[in-house]
């Protein structure tokens, strides 16, 4: 399909769904090779991947850059060390800061993924995460409120009463706040809420949490309502 001709669109090969830079180097090279060839031939305009901050040592960043990766998205989730530990993320705040610094030094485009609603989060910790992300100056951010999925430790904690999921109204309010805050700092928020799927729409595998197929629209509606209300007050 790529070889059928170019248009004025921006074409990109993306490797999502896991921590790309953490898989064996030979596997990375095997899938990057055809993408890099297409990039060199002008058939695509860029390559991006998603990964975790503690899998972005200098040698990892150099490898990605040498194989044509132009954008890296990092699963940050929170900048609160206690929350990250409770979620068993395996990384900490400093790992994020270091990873972003290395990517910036190499001139790569940086995206950060944030998950409001993790266990232990408070309004104060959410605001502190928002400020920390602003200070890192990424090129863009994605906001994914936590959903409780079947057959996970979080589902067990939810059923045991040890975790309380965000309501839809809470998640929309958080999303509106974060988007307002980051966009005021000229940081683009390119997505709020998970991409709708047939499984999620039918509730399959979803135990709890603020899923809505039009979550992004709900956030935008909230932002506009708040602006109008502020003008009326």
Task: Give residue ranges: language-model regions.
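Conserved non-cysteine loop/helix-boundary elements of the Radical SAM core domain that shape
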Residues: 17-169
């Amino acid at each position: 399909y790529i070889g059928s001709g170019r248009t004025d669109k921006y074409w990109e090969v993306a490797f999502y769904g896991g921590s790309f830079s953490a898989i064996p180097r030979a596997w990375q090279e095997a899938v990057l090779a055809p993408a890099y060839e297409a990039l060199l031939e002008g058939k695509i305009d860029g390559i991006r991947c998603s990964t975790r901050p503690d899998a972005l040592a200098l040698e990892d960043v150099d490898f990605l850059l040498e194989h044509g990766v132009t954008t890296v998205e990092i699963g940050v989730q929170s900048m609160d060390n206690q929350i990250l530990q409770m979620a068993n993320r395996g990384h900490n705040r400093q790992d994020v800061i270091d990873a972003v610094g290395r990517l910036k030094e190499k001139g790569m485009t940086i995206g950060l993924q944030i998950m409001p609603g993790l266990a232990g989060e408070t309004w104060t910790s959410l605001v502190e995460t928002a400020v920390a992300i602003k200070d890192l100056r990424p090129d863009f951010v994605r906001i994914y409120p936590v959903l409780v999925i079947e057959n996970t430790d979080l589902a067990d904690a939810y059923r045991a009463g040890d975790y309380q999921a965000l309501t839809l109204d809470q998640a929309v309010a958080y999303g509106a706040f974060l988007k307002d805050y980051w966009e005021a700092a000229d940081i683009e928020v390119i997505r709020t809420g998970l991409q709708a799927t047939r499984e999620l729409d039918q509730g399959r595998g979803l135990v709890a949490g603020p899923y809505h197929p039009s979550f992004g629209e709900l956030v935008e509606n909230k932002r506009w309502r708040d602006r109008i209300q502020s003008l009326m007050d």
